[in-house]
């Protein structure tokens, strides 16, 4: 029997609440604190109800957080301009996202999920975000653009990780962002 629109919306709202609660727990206490039991208790449902929404349990919830995180990051990186003109704002948006959402960024960077990267099976939102990096750094060929985008992504990730662990001087954030943008600016 088909679900009513009201039932479908109720299910969607509960799933959003589960994911939002997982993010809150992770931001407060780290990902190791995110368990099915704690999530069920926090939102006031039984564990079987939670599994009904996410049959893969915690792993499926974390994967959803990762996809949502990449969706939010892509939205943040949609900056005005085209190509290399977007590089400074894109660098700033990426680093701000990682700084403002440390637990989500941690999951995006290191959680073991079923998400496939650098493949035709990569989710569209991840390909879109990577495409923004490719267009910003440019290159003489598809391969050159992909490598330059991977290097930019790796650089931004490294900065994000060092900053998250207080290994960089926060007073230099703007200078660092400008330096990364200049480093990856296209050269004729």
List each model region and its residues.
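Amphipathic alpha-helical linker/stalk segments
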Residues: 65-89, 118-127, 133
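Helical hydrophobic small-molecule/effector-binding pocket
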Residues: 88-109, 118-121
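Generic hydrophobic, amphipathic alpha-helix propensity
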Residues: 14-22, 39, 65-73
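Helix-turn-helix
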Residues: 17, 21, 25-60
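Amphipathic alpha-helical packing segments from all-alpha helical-bundle domains
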Residues: 109, 115-151, 173-185
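Amphipathic C-terminal alpha-helical segment
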Residues: 153-170, 185-188
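N-terminal intrinsically disordered/low-complexity leader segments
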Residues: 1-13
